[in-house]
Amino acid sequence: MGDEIVPPANQLAADNLENDGSTVQKAQFSDRVLIRSILGGGAKLAGQKVRIGGWVKTGRQQGKGTFAFLEVNDGSCPANLQVMVDSSLYDLSRLVATGTCVTVDGVLKIPPEGKGLKQSIELSVETVIAVGTVDPTTYPLPKTKLTPEFLRDVLHLRSRTNLISAVARIRNALAFATHSFFQEHSFLYIHTPIITTSDCEGAGEMFQVTTLINHTERVEQDLIDNPPPTEADVEAARLIVKERGEAVAQLKVAKASKEEITASVAQLSVAKASLAHVEERLRLKPGLPKNDGKIDYSNDFFGRQAFLTVSGQLQVETYACALSSVYTFGPTFRAENSHTSRHLAEFWMVEPEIAFADIHDDMNCAEAYVKYMCKWLMDKCGDDMELMDKNVDEGCTKRLNMVAKASFKRVTYTEAIERLEKAVAQGKVVFDNKVEWGIDLASEHERYLTEVEFDQKPIIVYNYPKGIKAFYMRLNDDEKTVAAMDVLVPKVGELIGGSQREERYDVIKQRIEEMGLPMEPYEWYLDLRRYGTVKHCGFGLGFERMIQFATGIDNIRDVIPFPRYPGKADL
């Protein structure tokens, strides 16, 4: 995975251009022209003078060093623009190295026939404006094949590779599509907090936010640099305060002058401040502050335990119970010590909530949203998806087109288990995880259902056992299952998880108690049921999972710009 992936040269989707191709498109806040616009316009742009800026993907000197050809990319599209530079304009040896940044002015020309160039246009340079040189002996990204593992160690540079830059454009398009979908359907975008005191999942695998450790480190260093006072020091300070107080009293009895009394009172104040400082330092103890053997958070920054959010769902529900249709889209965090290709410590979630809606409305919304994103990618990112199809996962574009048009089959959890058990009994498949009613479906089960049982089609599984789902999911009439649903897709398995929320106060309170969760942190959540409760539902989509599904990239660490996982938090 690196610059060995060759981008498409002349397959830019017309939708990517904001003009008819007869004129170049300038960057709005720069004097350069987008390479995407030049390649999209093709031969119709011949003769126009433009300024382009970008990074050299490959460069070669020809004609015994009299000129050079540069393949330049500016990130606006996966394809490169061929740029020809004469040696009279610049030292060619400083231009041809991979990674060199160039800004040049020139004239667009139609390449001579027979050059074998796939593009219908190239740039003949007239002026070299600026050059950011590269030492090819030390540049970490040579033209040789680069592994994903290597690129994760150079996060600050890996976006220069063809694959990662394509992922960035696809990620951008999916984010745009997300906002577009929900805004078109009259949802309001709500910013939910990153720091929270609630655990939405009840799993306890949360990152804690605290300043106690910083405070403790400062105290311990202070105690080393300035040893704490003794009891004798405190008694001496108290004696000075007593003496200063008696001196003030004597002056008042003797009817001393105002100036003398004021000066004596000032000395008393200094003595009291000194005593307070000594007593405070005497109370300083190394280690975290404790109360009854437990860490005391009352003096922490928020006055209580606080965490990085695992989901914005609970908070965004408060707005759904006032504004009806809302969504949040932001980072979430899980402190799972997992080293798999499916898990990150920091990832992004899309979480809509819909008032006056039930589980069936929830499934309808989830299906429409996934279809919308798939169609958006094919319409807006055809060139990047072509790159993925050719170099990463052959058939990924076919998969997107299929999902965009398919009807998502809906099956109950019980039916899904029966299908899996039947497949095992018939010897069609052997799973690592045992199949029985009551289990949480593993990834291998989810993928078998979508890829085999339902012939590479997306499905929605609903009505899960209550024992494997969160407290806020609505209890069904059978009191064994909850109105929960998961959207399963080929390649990744679960893409979306959602449910109708429990709107009945007595039922949700009982569920919190059953799961052994403390009631106090959720009192505000219970208020939503105490005061004007409403039927509502929602779901969460793992944004990185969606990118994996679209691109076919196996490791989730390669679809987020700056992956965080156990042992890694670079930059």
From Swiss-Prot:
Principal location listed in the UniProt entry: cytoplasm
DNA-binding region: 50-128
Organism: Arabidopsis thaliana (Mouse-ear cress)
CC per GO annotation: cytosol
SUPFAM superfamilies from the UniProt entry: Class II aaRS and biotin synthetases (SSF55681), Nucleic acid-binding proteins (SSF50249)
Recorded catalytic activity of this chain's protein: tRNA(Asn) + L-asparagine + ATP = L-asparaginyl-tRNA(Asn) + AMP + diphosphate + H(+)
Residue ranges of every copy of the WHEP-TRS domain listed in the record: 233-289
Gene: SYNC3
Signal peptide limits: none
Keyword hit for DNA repair: no
Family membership: Belongs to the class-II aminoacyl-tRNA synthetase family.
Alphabetical list of Pfam families matching this protein: tRNA-synt_2, tRNA_anti-codon
Record EC number: 6.1.1.22
GO BP: asparaginyl-tRNA aminoacylation
Name this polypeptide is given: Asparagine--tRNA ligase, cytoplasmic 3
Residues bearing PTM N-acetylglycine: 2
InterPro entries: Aa-tRNA-synt_II, aa-tRNA-synth_II, aa-tRNA-synth_II/BPL/LPL, Asn-tRNA-ligase, Asp/Asn-tRNA-synth_IIb, NA-bd_OB-fold, NA-bd_OB_tRNA, WHEP-TRS_dom
DNA-binding keyword on record: yes
Location(s), subcellular: Cytoplasm, Cytosol
Record keywords, A-Z: Acetylation, Aminoacyl-tRNA synthetase, ATP-binding, Cytoplasm, DNA-binding, Ligase, Nucleotide-binding, Protein biosynthesis
